[in-house]
Amino acid sequence: ITIYTLAYAASIPVMGKLADRYGRKPIYLLSIALFGIGSLLCGLSQDVGSFEMLIIARAIQAIGGGGILPIATAEFGTSVPPEKRGMALGLVGGVYGVANIFGSSAGSLILNIFGSHNWQYIFYVNVPISVGIIVCGLIFLPNHKVEQVAKIDLLGITLLVAMILSLLYGVRNIDFFDLQA
């Protein structure tokens, strides 16, 4: 389990709740900004030679990433007519799957072009993409009126995040082949 996986899994429900409370557009744009800033800091960590900075930057990147898919999915779920909703949500899932495959391939290509000692470019490529998405989002994403939602349950969110992190850590570290009856 990496810091990215832990922060990503923990941030998904938090970002979803924040989007319900403050609106999808601002939290989606915040998520993209955090992802872009985290990516920039990941690249800079190579330049300053700081492994600690890389770990913190990956966590920032993951927190931003944790808001992107659920908020986009929720937006498609409410803005698309019910008869086309299945197709739209399938498209979102398909794009996300292709993006994961393309991202890995693009990262390999970048390493082949610039050399493995210049791995920071894998992260730098996300920065202009994030800026472009933010600009397009500011222009094209609708501003939905936020309905009155109950206050954010900080204790509940804290317990949920702790449970998710514990579960991920436990599943990752259990030795299934050495279980005693």
Can you say where each PLM-predicted feature lies in the sequence?
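Helix-loop-helix hairpins in multi-pass membrane proteins, especially solute transporters
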Residues: 19-155
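Central cavity-lining transmembrane alpha-helices of secondary-active solute carriers
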Residues: 2-16, 69-73
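ATP/adenylate-binding site constellation spanning eukaryotic-like Ser/Thr protein kinases
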Residues: 15, 103, 164
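Short, contiguous strand/loop micro-motifs
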Residues: 1-2, 97
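Phenylalanine-glycine-rich, low-complexity intrinsically disordered regions
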Residues: 145-146, 161-181
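Alpha-helical transmembrane segments of integral membrane proteins
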Residues: 5, 11, 130-133, 160-163
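Hydrophobic/aromatic residues in alpha-helical transmembrane segments
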Residues: 2, 72, 137, 166-170
